[in-house]
Amino acid sequence: MQGSAKHITIINTGCANISSVRFAFERLGAQVTVTDDTHTIARAERLILPGVGSAPAAMKSIKQKQLVECIQGLKQPVLGVCLGMQLMVTSSEENDLGNKANTACLDLIAGEVKRMQVNQLRI
């Protein structure tokens, strides 16, 4: 990042490897804030939505932190990383074991994350 340092806000979803994402942006010269505070998120200039793990667990954490409406109302640029990008769609076929229903996601992008069809291949 050239010139003055850019400020990046990482949304603390509770389901992410935040230290890796933070370190990557700091190496690029960015000033980084990590937060789950809705007021700080709403005022941020640029946002990162990271995620690791499963869609159901991440959405549960985002709901518990009362971040859904805040994230859905953002007008500024948001970069989804890994699971964070997947959570930006309407729903995911990934679900809790024993639950056949799709996981409702953030619905920022119309679409659905589909399971890979492996046709009996081991992955």
Explain the meaning of each model-derived region.
Residues 32-43:
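Short acidic low-complexity segments
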Residues 1-7:
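Extreme N-terminus of proteins, especially the signal/transit-peptide cleavage junction
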Residues 31-32, 113:
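Generic structural signal for residues in well-ordered beta-strands
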Residues 14, 38, 112:
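Residues in the short beta-alpha loop(s) of Rossmann-like NAD(P)-binding domains
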Residues 55-123:
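Cysteine-nucleophile active-site neighborhood
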Residues 8-30:
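N-terminal beta1-alpha1 ligand-phosphate binding loop
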Residues 41-51:
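Short acidic/histidine-rich motifs immediately flanking catalytic phosphotransfer sites
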Residues 31, 46, 77-79:
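Structural signature of beta-strand start/N-cap positions in the alpha/beta core
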